Amino acid sequence: MLYQSSIGSVVLAAALLMSPASAQVYPDWSGQWRGTVFRYDPSKPVGRGQEAPLKEPYRLIHEASMADQAAGGQGLYLSSARCVPMGMPWQMYAFFAMEFVFTPTTTFVLSEAMTAQTRRIYTDGRAWPEYQDALFTGYSIGKWIDEDGDGKYDVLEIETRYMRVPRIYDQSGIPFHEDGEAVIKERLFLDKADPNILHNQMTTIDNALTRPWLVERIYRREPKVIWTETNCVEDNDIVVIGNEDYRLSRDDGLLMPRKKGQKPPDLKHFNQAQN
């Protein structure tokens, strides 16, 4: 192994953990942020052409996932059914609250999704490791940049590799290539005209795509930070059996189909009757 997305609400808060002498170098990302605009490709007008530039057969895999979801199934969206962490890049779409914690050597991205999903972005100048276990969040190396030369960092550039596969780009089921060689490059920066707007431009390079794919997430700052917990297991009424997922009735505890025409599972070892 080499190198190893719908509008949601996002909360981002920055805590600066460093000496007073160095604190002024970092941008002010304090406060709470929520997603306002999500553009699949800001270089193109809204409409056709915004979809992922998928090769065959990955386009067909994506279409099958969306068709299954339209029929009531999960498609390739397994996070809610199987409590699989979102990981990268989905974590940065941020359906759930996130907090940025800056240190001179590492930027931590703490997410309330799955209660405790932590992403580490190493900013200590390290090289890529010769080998790294694949992770849901991947392995990220970042660099702070002072673009306007005023002595304060403006942009955080990040490259992420070593992401676990199989992996999808968003809840619609846009698939990554199974070779695990995807690379995601990000640029995070405040809007120059409005410091209460934060941009996150993500470019994905993957062998399931015909070309590098740029998407942009835009967040708005809110004055107060509200942090809650998200637990996938609690009150989850989805039961996965084999490659199918069903719902568990809260009234009588029996399995129910999730989509029209869904066949019942083999329950011969249980007392539940099959129709």
Model segments located where?
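N-terminal secretory signal peptides that target proteins for export/translocation
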Residues: M1-Q4
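Hydrophobic small-molecule pocket/channel-lining residues, especially in calycin-type beta-barrels
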Residues: A21-N275
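Bacterial N-terminal signal peptides
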Residues: G8-S19
